Amino acid sequence: MTPKYPKYAYIEPTIKSKKKSLLIIGSKTYKQSTVDAMVEEAEKKFDEVLFAPIDKIQIQTSEGKASLFYKGKNLLSFNAIYPRISSRDFLLGEAVMKAIEKSNAYCPVTLDSYQVSNHKFYTSQKLSGQGVPGVLSTLSISPKYADYAVNETGYPFVMKLISGFAGKGVVLINSKEQMESILDAIHLFEEFICTQKFIKGKDSDVRCYVVGDYVIAIKRKSKKGDWRANVSRGGSAMPINPTPEMLEIAKNSAKILGMDICAVDLMEQKNKWVVIEVNFMPGPFRKYLGTMVVHEWIRFLADYTEKKMEKHFQKGHAKQI
């Protein structure tokens, strides 16, 4: 007697379209030239590309699930989402990042990485806890405790506002008198303060753009009369070949913080490289690197999205009938 075997029907994968789509979310004060460069490059790799400023995005919550809309379009329907949200938009940014994290879209950064990287002290704390070399840092909430911190760093030292970016909110303190006058002003705004040991004799640093396993390095030099090696503040820059030590520190920092795309700023201290800070939404330095960084961002997003989609299409399954 021939045994009866159950019949099976093939169930198609849940994804209906093979079209690749990319959403880029920008801050309220986004740089138009950077957006244009990213969109132009993305249109070569993706079938659909959309840029949405965060202040124009509508967030809806229903039954514990958040949705994002821009001009009536469901933003969580995109295959890939690259949020470039600054600390200025932190509260709204957290809500947007949380919604993205619960969607099926690929995102090269996480809610946790957004929260930590926008808090300079927490960044240092998390990295140092995993053995990544960094600069001696302290967190203070009052002039009194900032004064105690100086006993560890000594003068001069670097003072950073937690919410600062692009070299803003960063001051070199050379004396107790200077510190006290600045702290009095900061205390009026109830700002948290991160202090870091100043590395003397260094007028340059290295920014490592981490894009997956690939790293682009650029050496930044401060302008004359300014100790900050920040191009947005008038400094200069040039591409370099990263050393194995730079590569290891940059990649490890990105991995610990949960970012596939970011920038890790390094400075040399006692013949060793240390992390100064990690940037969640770095500028592409097009003046010095052309479209190199933008190209790598988009290439990585497109390749990762394609691989993820292929896995979904291959996940058809058999169901007994």
Pin down the residues of each PLM region.
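Protein kinase-like catalytic core scaffold
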Residues: F157, I216, C262, V274-I276
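Phosphate-binding site of ATP-dependent enzymes
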Residues: V171-L257
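Short glycine-rich anion-binding loops that position phosphate/pyrophosphate groups of nucleotides
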Residues: S86-R88, S163-G164, M281
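ATP-binding N-terminal substructure of ATP-dependent carboxylate-amine bond-forming enzymes
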Residues: M1-Y106
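C-terminal active-site "lid" helix and adjoining low-complexity regulatory extension at the edge
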Residues: P3-P6, K255, E268-I321
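Active-site nucleotide/adenylate-binding loops and adjacent lid/helix of ATP-dependent enzymes
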Residues: Y10-K28, Q32, D36-E40, L75-L76, ...
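Short glycine-rich, acidic/polar surface loops and turns
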Residues: A250, I261-Q269
